[in-house]
Amino acid sequence: MTAPPSSSSSPSIGALLGSRAGHLAMAVLVVELLAGMQVYLNQTVLPLLATEMGARNTYGLVTAAAQVPAFLTMPLGGAMLTRWRPARLMTALTVLLVVGAVVGALAPNVGVYVLGEILRGLAAGALATATMGVMVAGLPDAWRRLCLAAGSGMWVVAALAGPVYASGVSASWGWRWALVAYLPVLIAARAVMATQIRDLSLDEETGRDEAVPWLPALAMAAGVALIGALRASNPWFWPGVAIGTALVLWSCSRVLPAGTLRLVPGRRAGIATLLWVCAFFLTLDFLVAPSAHDVLGMTPTQTGWALTAGGVGWSVVAIACGARPAREPEAYRRRTTLAAVFFVVGATLMVITVLGRPHW
């Protein structure tokens, strides 16, 4: 791997606008912002496309369509960087991502839309890993630290801009335009990255440090696909959920440090706790848009505000807790207890609101 370039410029506004490292860092942050916005875009658009296509019973399939390919290609990102020049690789993957988005926007039915999501997921998974590799290999230490710190802030901005963009464009021009209107910005950011890393190359020794976890990745993808593909009315739904969950847990046990899922005291228990908290939160978060649209009859704008509230709360609290970690046991217990109370109260309010609808 070529060594990270030395830079005589330290991070500053002038260097951000006028140096190679600054341009690359800015492009990385824009891509991070768009990745965050994509999460809210998918959630906002999901009930709209399902209603138009008469496919409300395929929420699980549509949601899994982009995630399953991403699980498969994420482990490949690093290996790809050692076989092809990063600039060419990122250009090819960006083209695939754009094609997937366009296919989804032009889809006449949910089957074609799922095909577009699969293409986009294949590209997005590899791009996520490749972008991190490019940041590590292509930026000096000071700029790398800046990107890592600012990346967290980008998710706060994404929580504000993502739902506003998705709901605004969907309400004004339709959900199909929402899937593609942001693409020129993405293409421009990726083009800047490709230009700034055109001379960057990684040798094959980088990819030999650790074997690609193919089997766990396949098990994870298969588990998520199985859960998402089965409809609730299918008699095999619950057996499929059980098998899919078992596959996901097994893949986690192979990837995570030994003892994590058994809650071995110490850092492993902390990782497991974080895993389960994220799983429960994201599960509820995926239900916000369909429930808001299908059950509560909210408009895209109102749904966007609901998604913004959760996203901003998550991002702001994460940054605040990261800046001031609870180092003492008492402070940690106090903080986690308060978080658990907020989580239970919020989830309870959501359930009561949905179940309180007469037709539900």
Name each region found by the language model.
Residues 30, 34, 46, 96-97, ...:
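Hydrophobic residues within membrane-embedded alpha-helical segments of Major Facilitator Superfamily
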Residues 21-38, 42-44, 63-66, 71-76, ...:
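12-transmembrane solute porter fold
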Residues 50, 54-61, 149, 300-304, ...:
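Small-residue hotspots at the loop-to-helix junctions and early N-terminal turns
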Residues 1-18:
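Short, Lys/Arg-rich, polar N-terminal cytosolic tail immediately upstream
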Residues 51-53, 83, 134-139, 172, ...:
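Helix-to-coil boundary motifs at intracellular loop junctions of multi-pass secondary transporters
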Residues 31, 62, 132, 150-154, ...:
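Hydrophobic alpha-helical segments of secondary membrane carriers
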Residues 71, 77-78, 82-207:
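Helix-loop-helix hairpins in multi-pass membrane proteins, especially solute transporters
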Residues 171-275, 280, 285:
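Hydrophobic transmembrane-helix bundles of small-molecule transporters
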